[in-house]
Amino acid sequence: MLFRKMVVVLGILLAGSLQADGHMPDEAALLKKAEAFIDAFYSFESEKLAPLLEYANTSADSILYYQAWAEGGNYKVMNRGGCKFTDQGTVKCPITVEDDLVLALKTGFLVTDTFEITFVNSEIGKIETSSNDQPIYYEARDWVKANRPEIMQTVCNDMWKSVDKAGECVRAMHEGYKAYFDSIEKSGGA
């Protein structure tokens, strides 16, 4: 009986110390902040996203551009994976989307964009993005650059620099991707 009481008391003390040292609540708070970032990003409202990027000096502009690009490209979340810590201490949030550019290529593929968030002193310090775009996506982009230079010289001239032009740029790229698909379909390659 005494042993059982000691085990219960020890368990209570250990549980209390885990919460007192802040380890678990910090992880939970960071994951909550990462999920809030994803909510804000896909709200397509920059005024919700910008405050979360206050300390992300090196990536804030590109993330705000990407948000405007995603809105202009009609990104639709198809599967929202939960944000999770990596072995490197960052948080990864995989989001599978449907978007106009990929739809123009008629592959039936859904792209997963992954946001890797680095926290500094409990604030978002840096965000890197990656995706599993298929090779045809990059082939189409290169085709647009070569065959529709007016797109690259006008609305996409400041690509990834001018948030104000992001939506217009992605819509022009969408037209270019459709033209690319039509060209390979006509040549018997699709």
Segments and roles (model prediction):
Residues 1-7:
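Bacterial N-terminal signal peptides that target proteins for export
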Residues 8-15:
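Bacterial N-terminal signal peptides
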Residues 18-43, 186-189:
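Short, low-complexity N-terminal intrinsically disordered segments enriched in polar/charged residues
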Residues 40-59:
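Short, well-ordered alpha-helical segments enriched in acidic and aromatic residues
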Residues 53, 95-99, 130-133:
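A mature extracytoplasmic/lumenal domain signature
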Residues 66-118:
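Surface-exposed, charged secondary-structure patches
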Residues 127-190:
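Low-complexity, intrinsically disordered terminal/linker segments enriched in charged
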